[in-house]
């Protein structure tokens, strides 16, 4: 039966809930992930009085969570993408700052070495000039080794960060599982899920998404979270653990695994998005290519300088040796191999060396070779034995006996080159600035024939420094050191004992031209000039890219990638800001609206209190009337 007091009391209770909820909204205006709550009122069932229905007041049917699943998912996705791009751009900037140092960078060190070569060319007999060349060579080597060390440190830093991020993801997953349990129990007891716990759970999912991309599936009052290629991170009240393990393909690299009740699952290839995805992308797209390219540049410098230096002569009269040395080709056995084969590799042609690693895999009948970066198959010759090595992309690969089907080996052509880069000579007198041979025409020659200075074709020829005489037996024929007669072609190549000369003009019968060792020619700078010219010649990419161009390209590529990453990050930040604003426009707390609601509920509450007061007055009047 309706009564004024009951109606007023129901109103007071409902409005008290509304005021409490509004105050709760205001209190959480700055709480990340908080969704605004709104009290839903329902009219109480009316009572029949006579022939009329009289109302009985109001009930609170629900404290509703103002939530849009689409907007939440959209903002979560853009936040995760922003975290990925920010992690990539931040690491890219570190790499760019290192390689782009114009004062102490690789280009500056290379220029210092080139300038020292020019000084030796100007004063080839100067010991101080040669000493400066060695010093600049060491400075260049130290810069390359330092860069390689810094890149390795960056890789180690990333691995350390991976371990920390994996632990945080595990803790967040455990928090979600715990909240799943609490929400389920609360919903079963009251019929409604607790809004604040739902917000907390969504907040944890947002935080995980900021670290790694995940997908969610609702199951009752719980949310299941999946990572990678669909591996379960959270199932109901059970959370799996993410950990870091050593990559079986590379002991220097860390990858991710999921520890579940049924065992360990490799999820590395499926990890994307968030901070972890950004770091993985940066390692794959920038860090590892930069390390390989730095090694390739080291190979180019050593190959070009050494080849020319071996064709020169030092102050002691000896042929030049290697000026620089580099690290060898690295080979890594995959940890899952079951065979006993030992694989080794050497470089045969620096011009054909690429900046990628390779995977050599044993099949039932032989081997396959593919690029590790793209997975593309590589054409090769040979079977892999010592007498018939596998030849591909400037490499010679020998696989020993004992490989089992499925065994894999990772070939690193350039990665270890930089760490072993150093100057191979210490004595300045051993700098081979001079050409090893000199050619001259006899002063008694009657003709007007001239001879070139000569060039070395094969510095390993045992007869290279043996004196040879070219004697013209007629105007059209000559012999070399008493050998058979040969037809004279003006300007034609004469190749003997590993050297080459050209004779021009019109030699007369009996004219003699002599090629001999250049020992003692301290003023000869021909090989020093050739050493400097060689650094500008093509040596990489099939002989089309010079050392200087390779250094400039590495710096430019890293700079371009960095700027692109920063632009992408800034653009995504705008998208994320819009997505968050769209979410907040629905779920966020608007203080103006809450203040208006508070005032409205306050006035209604006061009116309800007045209803109760009037009801009390009427009741008192009735009692007084009865007493009379």
Task: State the predicted function of each range.
Residues 1-628:
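S/T-rich, low-complexity, solvent-exposed segments of bacterial secretion/appendage proteins
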């Amino acid at each position: 039966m309706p009564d004024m007091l009951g109606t007023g009391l129901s109103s007071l209770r409902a409005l008290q809930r509304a005021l409490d909820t509004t105050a709760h909204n205001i209190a959480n205006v700055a709480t990340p992930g908080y969704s605004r709550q709104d009290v839903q009122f329902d009219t109480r069932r009316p009572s029949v009085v006579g022939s009329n229905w009289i109302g009985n007041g109001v009930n609170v049917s629900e404290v509703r969570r103002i939530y849009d699943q689409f907007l939440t998912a959209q903002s979560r996705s853009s936040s995760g993408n922003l975290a990925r791009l920010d992690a990539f751009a931040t690491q890219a900037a570190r790499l760019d700052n290192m390689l782009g140092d114009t004062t102490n960078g690789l280009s500056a060190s290379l220029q210092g070495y080139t300038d020292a070569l020019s000084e030796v060319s100007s004063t080839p007999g100067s010991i101080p000039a040669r000493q400066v060349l060695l010093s600049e060579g060491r400075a260049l080597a130290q810069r390359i080794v330092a860069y390689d060390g810094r890149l390795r440190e960056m890789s180690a830093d990333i691995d350390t960060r991976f371990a920390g991020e994996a632990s945080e993801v595990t803790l967040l997953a455990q928090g979600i599982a715990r909240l799943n349990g609490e929400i389920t129990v609360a919903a079963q007891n009251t019929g409604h899920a607790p809004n604040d716990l739902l917000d907390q759970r969504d907040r944890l999912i947002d935080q995980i998404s900021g670290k790694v991309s995940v997908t969610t599936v609702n199951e009752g009052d719980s949310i299941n979270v999946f990572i990678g290629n669909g591996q379960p991170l959270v199932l109901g009240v059970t959370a799996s653990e993410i950990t870091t393990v050593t990559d079986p393909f590379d002991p220097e690299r860390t990858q991710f695994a999921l520890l579940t009740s049924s065992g360990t699952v490799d999820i590395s290839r499926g990890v994307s998005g968030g901070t972890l995805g950004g770091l993985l992308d940066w390692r794959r797209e920038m860090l590892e290519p930069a390390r390989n390219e730095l090694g390739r540049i080291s190979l180019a410098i050593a190959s070009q300088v050494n080849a020319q230096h071996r064709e020169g002569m030092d102050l002691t009269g000896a042929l030049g040796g290697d000026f620089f040395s580099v690290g060898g080709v690295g080979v890594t056995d995959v940890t899952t191999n079951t065979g006993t084969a030992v694989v080794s590799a050497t470089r045969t042609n620096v011009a054909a060396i690429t900046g990628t690693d390779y995977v050599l895999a044993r099949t039932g009948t032989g081997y396959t070779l593919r690029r590790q970066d793209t997975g593309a198959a590589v054409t090769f010759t040979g079977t892999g034995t010592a007498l018939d090595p596998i030849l591909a992309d400037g490499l010679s690969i020998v696989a020993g006996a004992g490989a089992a089907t499925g065994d894999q080996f990772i070939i690193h052509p350039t990665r270890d080159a930089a760490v072993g880069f150093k100057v191979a000579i210490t004595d300045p007198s051993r700098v081979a600035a001079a050409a090893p041979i000199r050619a001259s025409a006899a002063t008694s020659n009657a003709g007007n024939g001239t001879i070139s200075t000569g060039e070395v074709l094969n510095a390993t020829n045992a007869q290279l420094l043996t004196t040879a005489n070219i004697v013209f037996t007629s105007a059209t024929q000559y012999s070399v050191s008493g050998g058979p007669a040969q037809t004279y072609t003006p300007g034609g190549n004469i190749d003997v004992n590993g050297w080459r000369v050209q004779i021009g003009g019109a030699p007369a019968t009996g004219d003699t031209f002599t090629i001999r060792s250049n020992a003692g020619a301290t003023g000869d700078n021909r090989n020093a000039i050739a050493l400097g010219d060689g650094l500008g010649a093509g040596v990489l990419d099939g002989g089309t890219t010079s050392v200087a161009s390779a250094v400039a390209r590495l710096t430019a590529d890293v700079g371009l990638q960095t700027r692109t990453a920063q632009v992408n990050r800034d653009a995504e930040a705008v998208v994320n800001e819009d997505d968050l604003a769209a979410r907040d426009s629905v779920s966020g707390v608007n203080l103006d609206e809450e203040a208006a609601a508070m005032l409205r509920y306050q006035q209604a509450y006061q009116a309800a209190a007045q209803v109760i007061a009037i009801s009390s007055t009427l009741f008192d009047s009735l009692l007084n009337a009865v007493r009379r």
